A protein has these predicted regions:
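N-terminal beta1-alpha1-beta2 submodule of the flavodoxin-like/Rossmannoid cofactor-binding fold
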Residues: 1-97
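Short, conserved loop/helix-junction motifs that constitute active-site signature segments
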Residues: 98-102
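Short, glycine-/small-residue-rich phosphate/pyrophosphate-handling segment
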Residues: 104-127
């Protein structure tokens, strides 16, 4: 069975999202489910070029294929100023559509220090 891909939804080095993604991965492994972590800090710089939308960089194809092959996605979404990180939006925009999401379960986990616990950050990408 293909693994569930856990996305640490920020490119901030040593982020809380990356730590939470690792905890989620451990939980899947304890239950006998294959799971891998991909941190947006690993995104190749070439995907931020304006031409990357029209012609996907070769370094991106491997990342995109991991998403397409995954059994599901589990996205850790940190709250940035009442929303989700722009880099997470860019990550989603760069993926093949609809193949990356079609008939695939997607779970969101919010991460924030505030009293609302990333409520808005998690609601927005669900829409």
């Amino acid at each position: 069975m293909n693994p569930i891909l856990i996305i640490a939804g920020t490119n901030r080095p040593s982020s809380n999202a990356a730590r939470i993604a690792t905890v989620i991965q451990s939980t899947y492994h304890r239950r006998g489910t294959a799971a891998e972590v991909y941190s947006l800090a690993e995104m190749p710089a070439s995907v931020f070029s304006p031409g990357a939308y029209a012609a996907k960089p070769p370094e991106w194809i491997e990342v995109q294929d991991r998403v397409v092959r995954s059994a599901g996605l589990h996205v850790v979404v940190p709250e940035y100023n009442g929303s989700f990180p722009g880099v997470l939006k860019h990550f989603i925009d760069m993926l093949k559509f609809p193949e990356s999401f079609e008939r695939k379960p997607v779970a969101f986990v919010g991460e924030a220090a505030g009293q609302w616990g990333a409520l808005r950050a998690v609601e927005q990408p669900e829409g």
